[in-house]
């Protein structure tokens, strides 16, 4: 896909752009966890990439601070809601900063800017005939003496009949509804059966906006799967949106309605505008340039797929009929699973961002792993903790940093820290030629493809170093000039790889820039190699391997007490650790019959009709790739496998299966503790090499 097609704006590579980017506002009622971090890492990578292109980008967010949950939690803690949200704001900001998420402004929806904008938008909607008042029946908690907000009523979904769903939307099927439509409702505050009482509420006439929304959602503003979901909701009919709540409530009072407050989902997205308005005031920016109806600036929202309804229906309609521009695009992502399952407190996989930082320390390990999984779609991604350790150690330590660690020392010791002439080099030319493809992947949020391509280039750089073996050249005085050239070429490759990885690994890139004594890298630096005689610093360790024990400690620290659970769990079979009995030993001659080869996974895809299999296309240096069916579907997404190196049995007799011919076997580890986990060779291994 070339610039100007698909998801890429026309002239994206040359014309200067002005972008306003937002991430969804985290609710100020709890800690940031690793599921939340998927979105903030994804959006931060995209923003950093755009800034490296030389575009003007403003990246804003805020805490979502209003609603009954905030009010009740503050009451429980014996503090004011304002005190609670100030404390949580500081915690959230620290978590994002330590994960290198670089907001240009991180604000709060409990601000005067947000109050003014929410009131102004409400008045504009009312003037346009889009606000109605209706007397409704609403649930009332007879124990707490309060009307119950949607999220404090639970019951059975009226559409799919899932149990324990909230009063405004079903987390199982995504349907929105009114609380009175719930089956067998109960108060989430007191547990009491609520009673119905009449009250006057304010509604946004969303049903009158359907023609506009049908056009807007099909105009390329949404991913195809999101647009299809819109079609389902249109088919069900759009309901008018209740935008008011009764006192007591922590939020903004509706200007002409004493005792009535804006529903949190009205003023929360307006918080994007308020955060930017605060930034604009501080930095002298023109607020209207980004928000007026004819704005030429681009507006992008990154969100989770669970809040698509609010951002793809309510929000654009609110903007349209109050006189503001609509988003250029809304990017929705999927959920995070850990080890193939929903995050769980009992299993220790409901992990907070702070717990990760306390145990694993380096945020860039997780930034890299998420980048290697995200492809711009709404698919869920899995954090497999063993694969996380293996991939980071293999890719970042064994491949990427390995290039510098094996060559930079010679520059310092033998050449006074000065680089030699790079000249023409086929591998460097290949690295530079990949720039447009990598840029396209980043632009379209397909960081999995970008990372895959970058690591393939790192393999080629490592192969260059291994082929020339500077450690051997250093022993031969007549090879001094060649040694200087080889190490200088390798460090130019390392510089280019650092440039490509910089949106993902900004902290590591900054350390490399200091080591190479260069200005912050931008995309324009691809064709600007370091000149002969350029002085670099002595090489210092850039990154360490992840210790699996730190990951294990993190999981243990996040486990809730399992004593009750353990009492009813049958005894697990002991995993054998004793030496293999002598009766099953094989001779070296027997082992030599097995032809184990390094294989590159050229392609991986699902097999229609197969519950456990993936179809792999394996390159082992032959004329054509081998087709192998592997029972690893439960552990791996096909996209995450493409480009990886693994180990296969190359001389296994072909086996005819109902899905086709399987021409070998990939090796994977598993036992009662988990798996399968495919094997990955160390850096330098190439397709076709024999494992001995």
Swiss-Prot record:
Instruction: Look up keyword Cytoplasm and say if it applies.
Output: yes
Annotated tRNA-binding domain residues: 590-692
UniProt-listed Pfam families = Anticodon_3 (PF19303), tRNA-synt_1g (PF09334), tRNA_bind (PF01588)
Keywords of the record, alphabetical order, are:
Aminoacyl-tRNA synthetase, ATP-binding, Cytoplasm, Ligase, Metal-binding, Nucleotide-binding, Protein biosynthesis, RNA-binding, tRNA-binding, Zinc
State how the cofactor is bound: Binds 1 zinc ion per subunit.
Protein location: Cytoplasm
The record's annotation in HAMAP family points to: Met_tRNA_synth_type1
Q: How does it assemble?
A: Homodimer.
Name listed for the protein in its UniProt record: Methionine--tRNA ligase
Organism for this UniProt entry: Methylobacillus flagellatus (strain ATCC 51484 / DSM 6875 / VKM B-1610 / KT)
What is the taxonomic lineage of the source species?
Bacteria, Pseudomonadati, Pseudomonadota, Betaproteobacteria, Nitrosomonadales
Q: Which gene produces this protein?
A: metG1
């Amino acid at each position: 896909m070339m610039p100007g097609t698909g998801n890429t704006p026309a002239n994206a590579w040359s014309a200067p752009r002005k972008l306003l980017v937002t991430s969804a506002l985290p609710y100020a009622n709890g800690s940031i966890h690793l599921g939340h971090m998927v979105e903030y890492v994804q959006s931060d990578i995209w923003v950093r990439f755009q800034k490296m292109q030389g575009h003007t980008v403003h990246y804003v967010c805020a805490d979502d601070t209003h609603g009954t949950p905030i009010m009740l939690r503050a009451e429980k803690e014996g503090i004011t809601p304002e005190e609670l949200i100030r404390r949580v704001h500081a915690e959230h900001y620290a978590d994002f900063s330590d994960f290198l998420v670089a907001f240009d402004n991180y604000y709060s929806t409990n601000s005067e800017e947000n109050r003014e904008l929410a009131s102004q938008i409400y008045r504009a909607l009312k003037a346009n005939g889009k606000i109605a008042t209706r007397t409704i029946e609403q649930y009332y908690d007879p124990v707490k003496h309060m009307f119950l907000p949607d999220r404090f009523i639970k019951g059975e979904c009226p559409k799919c009949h899932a149990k324990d769903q909230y009063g405004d939307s079903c987390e199982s099927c995504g349907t929105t509804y009114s609380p009175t439509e719930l089956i067998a409702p109960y108060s989430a505050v007191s547990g009491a059966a609520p009673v119905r009482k009449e009250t006057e509420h304010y509604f946004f006439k969303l049903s009158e906006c359907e023609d506009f929304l049908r056009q807007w959602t099909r105009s390329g503003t949404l991913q195809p799967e999101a647009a299809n979901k819109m079609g389902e909701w249109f088919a069900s009919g759009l309901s008018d949106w209740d935008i008011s709540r009764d006192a007591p409530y922590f939020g903004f009072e509706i200007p002409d309605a004493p005792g009535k407050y804006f529903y949190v989902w009205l003023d929360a997205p307006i918080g994007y505008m308020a955060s930017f308005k605060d930034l604009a005031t501080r930095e002298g920016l023109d607020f209207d340039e980004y928000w007026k109806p004819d704005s030429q600036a681009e507006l992008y929202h990154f969100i989770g797929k669970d809040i698509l309804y609010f951002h793809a229906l309510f929000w654009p309609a609110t903007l349209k009929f109050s006189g503001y521009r609509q988003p250029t695009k809304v990017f929705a992502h999927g959920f995070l699973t850990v080890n193939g399952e929903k995050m769980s407190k009992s299993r220790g996989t409901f992990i907070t961002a702070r717990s990760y930082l306390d145990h694993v320390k380096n945020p860039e390990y997780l930034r890299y792993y998420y980048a290697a999984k995200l492809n711009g779609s709404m698919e869920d991604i899995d954090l497999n903790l063993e694969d996380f350790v293996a991939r980071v150690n293999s890719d970042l330590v064994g491949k990427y940093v390995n290039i510098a660690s094996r060559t930079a020392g010679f520059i310092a010791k033998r050449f006074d820290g000065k680089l030699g002439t790079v000249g023409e080099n086929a591998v460097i030319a290949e690295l530079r030629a990949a720039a447009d493809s990598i840029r396209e992947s980043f632009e379209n949020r397909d960081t999995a493809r970008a990372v895959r391509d970058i690591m393939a280039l790192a393999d080629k750089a490592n192969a260059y170093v291994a082929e020339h073996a500077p450690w051997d050249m250093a022993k031969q005085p007549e090879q001094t000039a060649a040694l200087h050239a080889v190490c200088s070429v390798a460090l130019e490759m390392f510089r280019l790889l650092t440039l490509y990885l910089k949106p993902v690994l900004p902290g590591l890139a900054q350390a490399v820039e200091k080591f190479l004594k260069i200005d912050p890298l931008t995309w324009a630096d691809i064709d600007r190699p370091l000149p002969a005689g350029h002085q670099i610093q002595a090489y210092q360790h850039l990154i360490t391997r992840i210790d699996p024990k730190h990951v294990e400690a993190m999981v243990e620290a996040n486990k809730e007490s399992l004593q009750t659970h353990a009492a009813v769990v049958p005894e697990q079979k002991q995993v054998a650790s004793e030496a293999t009995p002598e009766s099953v030993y094989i001779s070296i001659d027997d082992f030599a019959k097995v032809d184990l080869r390094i294989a590159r996974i050229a392609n991986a895809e699902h097999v229609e009709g197969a519950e456990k299999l993936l179809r792999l296309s394996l390159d082992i240096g032959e004329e054509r790739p081998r087709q192998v069916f592997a029972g690893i579907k439960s552990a791996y997404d096909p996209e995450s496998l493409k480009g990886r190196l693994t180990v296969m049995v190359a001389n296994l007799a072909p086996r005819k299966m109902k899905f086709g011919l399987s021409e070998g076997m990939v090796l994977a580890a598993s036992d009662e503790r988990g798996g399968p986990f495919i094997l990955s060779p160390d850096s330098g291994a190439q397709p076709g090499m024999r494992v001995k």
